[in-house]
Amino acid sequence: EQRGWTVLLQAPPRKGIYGMANSKKKTIWVHPITEAMGIMPQTFVHEAVHAVQACKTGKMKPLGYKPALDYVVDRAVFNNLYRNYTSRKWAIEKEAFAIQAQPNRIPLIMGLIVEHCPIKPDEQAA
């Protein structure tokens, strides 16, 4: 939120999804049901990756971060991408899924936020 994004713990405007990031509205939604499902941290990190991907230009573009994934996770990510996303979104989604799958996902996303989304001097006073 320090970087101008709003984070909402409510159902995303699109049905059937657990999280959503809208770079035009600078808003992240995380569905409350993700807490009961035990996937809230992963969902939040995934959507936070999309916010970071949009920091510089306002449009989501891959950061170029390619963490190592074991074969099973890599195949699961690929199958999810193939079934649920258009090919033009694969790069940004693959990166978000890869980062959310890391055991150090929380410090990792915090570092990426600091690196790619610095607080502008005029925002620090707010």
What kind of feature is each model-predicted range?
Residues 48-65:
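Catalytic Zn2+-binding segment of zinc metalloproteases
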Residues 4, 22-25:
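Short, solvent-exposed coil/turn segments at beta-strand boundaries
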Residues 11-13, 32-34, 57:
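A mature extracytoplasmic/lumenal domain signature
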Residues 39, 43, 47, 91, ...:
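Extracytoplasmic/secreted proteins, especially bacterial periplasmic and envelope-associated proteins
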Residues 25-44:
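Short pre-active-site segment immediately N-terminal to the catalytic Zn-binding motif
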Residues 1-15, 61-126:
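Metalloprotease/metallohydrolase-associated module, dominated by Zn2+-dependent proteases
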Residues 19:
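OB-fold/S1-family RNA-binding modules
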